[in-house]
From Swiss-Prot:
Protein name per UniProt: Major pepsin inhibitor 3
Pfam families, per the entry: Pepsin-I3
Top-rank lineage group of the source organism: Eukaryota
Principal subcellular localisation of the protein: secreted
Compartments where located: Secreted
Disulfide-bonded cysteines: 33-79, 68-86, 99-166
Segments of skewed composition (Pro residues): 158-169
PANTHER family for the chain: PROTEIN CBG07421-RELATED (PTHR37969), PROTEIN CBG13105 (PTHR37969:SF1)
Length: 169
């Protein structure tokens, strides 16, 4: 019983460390844009609701993507070019522990929360600078045997934490 408890606690502790320090990603568009029931999704995140003339444009876009995908088997950008309501093609996406940022929008649990504030943008920029510095430090480190169980060895480098807006709402 004592061994089981110790192993369970050790497993919980190491998974907590790995989860809190290493789960983030950054990518640049274009991202997949889909339309369902007048709702636009970009990168599977709710982006906007269509209104007015955009409703017809959305239906035509969905039909064109369906045709390009299932009939023509042509996924080239010329065939599947999204309308402007899908957002800019060079948007950035950040997936942090606790939230995602796509373009100027904050999502938690894949639900839109709010647009980013100027302070949020500054935090993202600071995070990007810290990540660049962390990666440069990592490159300059001598080869090692890795990080057992996702834990940073004593005195090892740690990546920066995610922006505070991912944890404070």
């Amino acid at each position: 019983m004592h061994v089981w408890l110790i192993l369970s606690l050790a497993s919980l502790w190491t998974s907590s460390i790995a989860y809190s320090q290493f789960l983030f990603s950054m990518s640049t568009g274009p991202f997949i844009c889909t339309v369902k029931d007048n709702q636009v999704f970009v990168a599977n995140l709710p982006w906007t609701m269509l209104e007015g003339d955009d409703i017809q444009v959305g239906k035509e876009f969905a039909a064109r993507v369906e045709d390009c995908t299932n009939v023509k088997h042509d996924m080239a950008p010329t065939c599947t070019k999204p309308p402007p309501f899908c957002g800019p093609q060079d948007m950035k996406m950040f997936n942090f522990v606790g939230c995602s940022v796509l373009g100027n929008k904050l999502f938690i649990d894949q639900k839109y929360v709010r647009d980013l504030t100027a302070k949020d943008h500054a935090e993202v920029q600071t995070f990007r600078e810290k990540i660049a510095a962390f990666e440069e430090q990592q490159e300059n480190q001598p080869p090692s045997s890795g990080m057992p169980h996702g834990a940073v060895p004593a005195g090892g480098l740690s990546p920066p934490p995610p922006p505070s807006f991912c944890t404070v709402q």
